Amino acid sequence: MQLSMRMMFTPKHQKLVNQCYPTGRTTDKKPKSSETSYLLYYVNSRRSKLEKVSTYLIKRSTSDLNHRRIGNIAVTLDLMNKIVLHCKENLNVFVKDFLYIMNKVLSNNNFNNDVSVVELIELAFSSICQNLDDVLCNGDMEFVQLYQNFVDLFFKIVTERIHNDDMLLKCCIDISNTNSVSSNPQLNHFVSKSVAYTISKFQERNPKFKTLSLEAALESNLGKRLSRTQTRTIGLDKAAEDNHDLSVKALQSYFNTTETDKLNLSIRTLLRCLQSTPNKELLEFVCNGIPVQLRYIVILLLVRQLSDKDKNVNPIVSLKLMSSLLVSDVSIVGLSVLDIMRKLLNFQLKNATNKEVVAQSCITMTDLNHKTYYAEQTSDMLYELLLKLKSDTVKDVEKNAVVEDIDFLVEHITQPSISLELFIDLAHYMKNHIICLFNIVETEVPSSILFSKLYSLLRELDSHGVQKEMMEEIFDKYGKMALLSGLNYFLENVSEPEYTYYSYHLQAANFLKLNDYKSQTEYKMQTRTLFTKEDLLSYYSDTGSNKYSKKGAQILLSRDNQISTSDLLSDSQVRTTPLEYKNVPNAIFSNGKAVYDNNDFAAKQNKFDNSIDDNIEEANDTVISDANAKGSIYRFVAEDARSWKTMRATAPKVSDLKKTMNEKNIPNNMKRDGSFRGSQSVKSRVTNITFLLNELKTFSDDANKIKDPDEENIVGLDKIDVARSNSLRLAPISSLSDRSSIGNRKSFLQKTATGENQNDDFKDANEDLHSLSSRGKIFSST
């Protein structure tokens, strides 16, 4: 009667909870399925009852703990798990009550040694961790304290009382699944603790990852590298797919993540474990499970360990682990090679007196170049080492370490990757390994200045054997460019017999396959004499036996010793020397016949150069070529050093036309229809009207007038052209209105009278012309 009355006044949520418990005192109880389903429906439809249900579960579990009802505690834990899964949207309402219940159960020695009870606790905790939001972890201090107490207690129970490794690994996975636990300073130590437990259990289950394994990572034999690639062990990324080992899954939960806070803590813990048991296979196995875009963090943290003041950190172990990872098959992207190298180099130089650190740092920097992360990587690394060598603050012992770094790095470079300029800079510091350094120089054609520096460097070498081998390598790499640039260099810079001089000519003879050239070089080497230009021209005169004859002769006849690379590469270019002029026509008659007078033309050029200062007032009346103009930039440049665009033929002048006609004895009263006219180059180039009128002034009555071949009368100049020529002769350039003045035109015609008895009036063009200007035209038709 009392029981029925008590049930009558019991709240509904308590009735529903109590109905889920089966009767009896067995330890393997489970909640009734139908009653549990109704309870879940009830709390889902009436969310306000969730807090009342969780509060009642605390009261019910406390009573069961006091009476040691293990079966009822098991039912309570199972109900909690189901409520979490079905009401996860409102987890914040009851999660603290549930954590309180689990803590009470774990702290009771009558229950915490029961594996089934601990498993149910872990299952409920796993559901909670998977559905927690960031607010509880970062803002609710009560929840943080409950969470912290539970994890500490759980780790203690599973490691000290029940000794269940799987339960421990499951809890580690649950912690990994908790949102924002790694960003909370009060909880993130659980990440490191969980990773340490996980790695320890993984090594126990896989003993090969626990042994000491730090042998030399660098292997130069390609066959061994291929063999290692083909027998590559499965990494963490592949092992978890077909492996049910909880230690592997736990490792994957911590390392196969893009949450950088958690990954950072996990990698730090891994590296601390590897300090005690160094094993490069374990490092590679775990790194394969890290997302490829984040694997560079491992290298960064290994470098950071070098500056760690922790006595437990051995820098040699860190360097060897880094080397093993850099040369392994683990793909790494986004690695800042130069930043890593600078830190390694600074660490090496700070410990320059420690030979073991210096040697291992050298190996690690070389391993850093094992994979190419960007195009100019090798060149940049060598340039960084070169800067250290050139630094004034670096001591001698430190410079020796840097030179060893360069030697070891160059020794393991297999592809041409540096410029000739960088080679020349580095060669001064490593003359004992200059051949090995030259082998990695790119075959791109350098400038003539670099070739000069290269041959100068060659002359500075002490060993004749090295000089000979270097000369062979230069010809093998550059061929034609080595031949022609060397011909130019040794012709201009060597005046005394020396071994490099003869070594060049021997290689040139072998390159050209000229036995006579070779025997002559050997003879001159014995007699200690040098080649003359005439001697060398004999080998560069026959294009049949020497296809580089044209270029070689051009160099030998040139005054200037700085022949540009473009000149050496161009086969069609013809260089003009000061003693040779192109055979260009001075004038062309109307019948197409050309008149040549190059000797007189050359003499006139020299005459103009010498007299230009004395005749400055008549500068407007003289046409001077670009090469001889006093204000021209080409006046101070040797003719054989100009580009091919400036070597075009100089246009003939009207004075040359007059001289040609006088030499042909053309009468002054010749018929107008038989008069000559200038070539097309004269029409296009002679635009200065003042010059034209001055030349007409010294000619005879009829022959001195340039006539239109189709007209009987002299064609008058346009008004604007007349005004323009007047302004050019008499005054500075005026405005357009002044130039178009008719008065100026008349005064100009009066001042330019050619003689007392000569009538040389000009007629204006017809006024009905549509164009008001004919500027740039010499001839026009009416």
UniProtKB/Swiss-Prot annotation:
Originating organism: Saccharomyces cerevisiae (strain ATCC 204508 / S288c)
Transmembrane feature ranges: none
Protein name according to UniProt: Protein EFR3
Extra remark beyond the main annotation: Present with 1670 molecules/cell in log phase SD medium.
Gene symbol of the encoding locus: EFR3
Annotated positions of the Phosphoserine modification: 227, 564, 625, 632, 643, 675, 735, 771, 774
Family: Belongs to the EFR3 family.
GO cellular component term, pick one: cell periphery
GO terms of biological process kind: protein localization to plasma membrane
